[in-house]
UniProtKB/Swiss-Prot annotation:
CDD domains (UniProt xref): PseudoU_synth_EcTruA (cd02570)
Top-rank lineage group of the source organism: Bacteria
Class of enzymatic activity (EC top level): isomerase
Swiss-Prot/TrEMBL keywords: Isomerase, tRNA processing
GO biological processes: tRNA pseudouridine synthesis
One Pfam family, short name: PseudoU_synth_1
Subunit structure of this chain's protein: Homodimer.
SUPFAM superfamilies xrefs: Pseudouridine synthase (SSF55120)
Record's protein name: tRNA pseudouridine synthase A
Binding site for substrate: 111
Xref: PANTHER family: PSEUDOURIDYLATE SYNTHASE, TRNA PSEUDOURIDINE SYNTHASE-LIKE 1
Entry similarity comment: Belongs to the tRNA pseudouridine synthase TruA family.
Active-site residues per Swiss-Prot or TrEMBL entry: 53
């Protein structure tokens, strides 16, 4: 058996999320359907670097699957894209050692979150969070700096989070303004359920002047979801890049 690693992108608008769900359209479901056709009806399980929720997008999700087929690496994207719907694309594929795992071998993940602060744009409604308020980018970057490092992120994850260990390391956290768009960028060794969206929702409150940047430190210390801000909507979030050891 060969293990194939693929980098994929998808528009999450019309998906119930990445992970397979009964009676619902999912990214994993579309990938496994396409692979089943290529394997002449044989089921092939797909493993991903992590799950994304309904309406969340991916620019650089990573998956792997095992196959007995001898299709060359460079032909896998073309073969799969011919069978996948228009809102999922395989960008590249390569054979990897059997020790590689799309989820368990991850070293870093980068998420980006897009916020539109200008007038409502009907063509961007599925891809940015419309937030038409004056915000201070320097204040938000000051707030984000408190998140860099290793912390218990209990305050910044959903109460539905199933994992016990809520300690994560954030390596980079920043927001930049490009015209009428704010782009949040967070790089870490892993992220809890809704963590990026809660961080964005809270930091936007700092940007609006409703909180001071130093409150982020207090929120972390309290380890209480109710003291952080609202969860920003899913459609502004992108899984941008997943890093592994070479």
């Amino acid at each position: 058996m060969r293990r194939i690693k693929c980098t994929i992108a998808y528009d999450g608008t019309n998906f119930a999320g990445y992970q397979i769900q009964q009676q619902k359209r999912t990214v994993q479901g579309e990938l496994e359907r396409a692979l089943s056709i290529i394997h002449k009806g044989q089921f092939v399980r797909v493993y991903a670097s992590g799950r994304t929720d309904a309406t969340v997008h991916a620019y650089g999700q990573v998956i792997h699957f095992d196959t007995p087929l001898t299709i060359p690496d460079e032909r896998w994207p073309k073969a799969l894209n011919a069978l996948l719907p228009d809102d999922v694309i395989v960008k590249e594929a390569s054979e990897v050692p059997s020790s590689f795992h799309a989820r368990f071998s991850v070293k870093k993940k980068e998420y980006r979150y897009r916020v539109w602060i200008g007038e409502k744009n009907v063509f961007l409604r599925h891809y940015v969070y419309h937030h038409p308020y004056d915000v201070s980018v320097p204040a938000m970057n000051e707030a984000l700096r408190y998140l860099i490092g290793t912390h218990d992120f209990t305050s910044f994850c959903s109460a539905k989070t199933e994992v016990d260990d809520k300690v994560r390391t954030i390596y980079e956290a920043e927001v930049v303004q490009e015209g009428e768009e704010l782009i949040f960028r967070l790089v870490g060794n892993g992220f809890l359920y809704n963590m990026v969206r809660i961080i964005v929702g809270t930091v936007l409150e700092v940007g609006r002047g409703e909180r001071c940047a130093e409150e982020i430190k207090t929120i972390l210390e309290q380890k209480n979801r109710s003291v952080a801000g609202k969860t920003a909507p899913g459609h502004g979030l992108y899984l941008w890049h997943v890093s592994y050891d070479n």
